[in-house]
Amino acid sequence: MAKKILGYIKLQVKAGSATPSPPIGPALGQRGVNIMGFCKEFNARTENVEKGTPLPTVITVYQDKSFTFITKTPPATHYLKQITGLKSGAKLTGRETVGEVTRTQLREIAEKKMKDLNANDLEAAAKIIEGSAKAMGLKIVEA
C-alpha cells in the first residue's frame, strides 16, 4: 500500500550547502522530518552540481515522517545572471537596462530548463526565458 502524503514543502536550496539552519530547519522541523537526514541526502545528491547554485526543491513528507525530494533545474534568472555577469537585475524594470543577452543564449537556457518549463516546444520555452530576461532589465539582441 502506498504511503499517505502529509504534505509538500517547496524550498530553494543552494547545491551542496544544505544545513539545518533557516529556512531548511524550521520548514522540515514543523513537519517532524529528520533535518540532518535531508541535509546529508541533499548534499550527496547535489555534489556534482556547482556548489552554491540555487536549486528549487520539492520535498514530499509522508505520514510516517519519512520523505522524498525532487530537485529541479536552477531558476532562469540564475542562468541569465551567470551569462551577463550581473549580481542582480534592474531596480526599475522596464525603465533601465542593465545588460544584453542574445537570442542564441536564451535558446541555450531554454534547452537546459525545458523539462521544468510549461512549454511544448523550444520556441515557447525561449519566449518564457525572454520574459524573465526582460523582467530583469536585460535587452534582447539578435546574434
Swiss-Prot record:
GO molecular function terms listed in the Swiss-Prot or TrEMBL record: large ribosomal subunit rRNA binding; structural constituent of ribosome
PTM per Swiss-Prot/TrEMBL: One or more lysine residues are methylated.
Tree of life domain: Bacteria
InterPro entries from the UniProt entry: Ribosomal_uL11, Ribosomal_uL11_bac-typ, Ribosomal_uL11_C, Ribosomal_uL11_C_sf, Ribosomal_uL11_N, Ribosomal_uL11_N_sf
Keywords: Methylation, Ribonucleoprotein, Ribosomal protein, RNA-binding, rRNA-binding
A matching Pfam family: Ribosomal_L11
Family stated for the protein in its record: Belongs to the universal ribosomal protein uL11 family.
Quaternary context: Part of the ribosomal stalk of the 50S ribosomal subunit. Interacts with L10 and the large rRNA to form the base of the stalk. L10 forms an elongated spine to which L12 dimers bind in a sequential fashion forming a multimeric L10(L12)X complex.
Name of the molecule in the record: Large ribosomal subunit protein uL11
